[in-house]
Amino acid sequence: MTYTVTRAGQPLPGGPPYDVTVIGAGVVGTAIARELARYRVRTALVEASDDIGNGTSKANTAILHTGFDAVPGSLEARLVREGQRTLAAYAAGTGIPVERVGALLVAWDEEQLAALPDLLAKAEKNDYHAARLLDADRLAELEPNLGPGALGALEIPDESVICPWTTPLAFATQALLAGVHLHLDCRVTHIGSGPGLHTLTTSRGPIRTRQLINAAGLHADEIDRLLGHDTFTVTPRRGQLIVFDKLARDLVHHILLPVPTAAGKGVLVAPTVFGNVLLGPTSEDLDDKTATESTGHGLAQLREKGRRILPRLIDEEVTAVYAGLRAATGHEDYRIKEYPDLRYIAVGGIRSTGLTASMAIAQHVAGLLARTGLDLGAPTELPPLTLPGLGEATDRPYLDAALIARDPAYGTVVCHCERVTAGEIRDALDSVLPPRSA
C-alpha cells in the first residue's frame, strides 16, 4: 500500500490543488484529517515541525475528560461530552490504552468544601449525573495516602486516563492509509487567497488548496491573521510536570484534582496508563511559544504542592520532567468559526480538553465545510487499525511468553524504566509513520 509523507529536502507533490488543506498535525489536526479521509476529497495535512503531535499534544496530563466542569451550553461542553464517548470507543477498537480510574476533586479548606455542591450542580447541567459528594471518612477510604486536612471531595467516576501519543498517531496513520498527504517540516508563512483558491507559501514551496482549515494550535492566531482576521490571541500557558517511577503507582488510585480556579484545573496527581504517576501542571502565562523547558522554580512549586496532596509521593524516584504549552485565548469557549466567503475554518483556543474532544471537533468541522461550499458526499468506513499495546493494564510484549518464543526481540528489554523491547522499537521504525532520529 502506498501513502504520501514528505519531509524537508523532498519536493512537494504536483498535480491539481487539494480540495482541503489542514494546517497543524496535533491531535485536533490529525483527527480532522482522519475524518476527511472518510470522504472523496483530496486532502493535505501540513505541519511546521518534523513530526505529528509535536506541540501541546505531546506534553499534557493525558486525561480523557467527561466535561463535567465545562461551561454549560458552550460548544466545548458539547464537543467534550460527544468526544469522550467517541474517543473511548475508538480507543477500545484500536488498542489505544485507556483506564477508567475516576477523579476526586479534593477540598482542603471550608471555602473549597462549600464550592463542591455548585460543582455537582454544574456537572448535572452538563448532563453528567454520576458525580457524588464524599465526606472526609469516605475520601480517606478511597485514597488512604492523601495528606492530612482533606475535608471531602466530589467524585467523578468516569474520568479516565489515556495515551496522548498513540491517539494522534492512530488518526494520522488511518488518514495516510486512506490517501491523505502529510507534509512535515512545512511552515506556512503567507496565504494568498483568490477566487476559488488559496495559495500557501511554505518553507518548502507553494501549496494550492480550495478549502483551508486552521488547526495550528499555539500558532492558530498567527495563521488566522494571515487570512485578515484578528479575533483571538493565543497566550502560551506553560504547564510543567513531574513523572514518578512505576513503583509509586500504588500510592494513588484516582486522578486527584484541586477545586478549580479561573487559571485552570490546578495541580493534580494522576496515575498514567503507563504505570507512572504524574504531578502537575504549573500554570504560567508566557510570551514565548517555544518555552517548553522545565525550571527549578516550577519544579520546586510542584513538589511543595505534591507534598500536601500525597506526601509519600515526594520520596519516590523521578523518571522524568517535562513541560508543555497550552493555547490560552482569554475566552471561555473554543474559537471555532467558518468563513464561507473565504472557504476557511478557524479551529482555535483548543485547550486541555482538546485530546478528549478531538474526534467530535473533527466531525463538527466536517459539518462546517458544507457551509464553506464543499460537498463532501457520503462517508465511507476506514480500514481497521490496531496499534501496539503500550498500557501497563494489558499484557505488554515483554510479558508475553508465546510472543517471545516466536520472536525473541520482544524479550530483549532495551529501556528498563518503561520496559520497552527491541521488537517494539523495530516495529515502530517499520510503521507507516516511523519516528525520526536526528
Where are these predicted regions, by residue range?
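Glycine-rich FAD pyrophosphate-binding loop
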Residues: 37-59
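Extreme N-terminal leader/targeting segments of oxidoreductases
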Residues: 1-20, 38
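Dinucleotide-binding Rossmann-like beta1-alpha1 core, especially the glycine-rich loop
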Residues: 62-138, 142, 151, 266-267
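Helical element adjacent to the flavin cofactor pocket in flavoenzyme catalytic cores
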Residues: 154-211
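Flavin-dependent oxidoreductases
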Residues: 31, 191-280, 284-293, 304, ...
